[in-house]
């Protein structure tokens, strides 16, 4: 049975200094990764400094950026922690995509030293006729 969708989870460690707190870098990454993997945007990315509540920083030790871009095929989200230079990326799509393209593109943008990754077939019991 064909899966409903596919998730690729990429955890990036020891990213380039400043990358995990760079709002514009995250925005450009989300905007361009869509084309790299052949997906279709539903809107422009939403990217914010986090964690904040109406502009007030709540947890300085977790300072960073969170972002999301909705896709016709599903969505991509990213979260980062500047104090530890850690960035997480989740790509979810109803269509198959090349995870090596995602990983290499992320490496170019965030210059991580090492990473961990998981690829998951979602909805394997879904009757996708």
Question: In which residue ranges do the predicted regions lie?
Answer:
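Polybasic/polar functional segments that serve as interface/processing modules
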Residues: 1-129
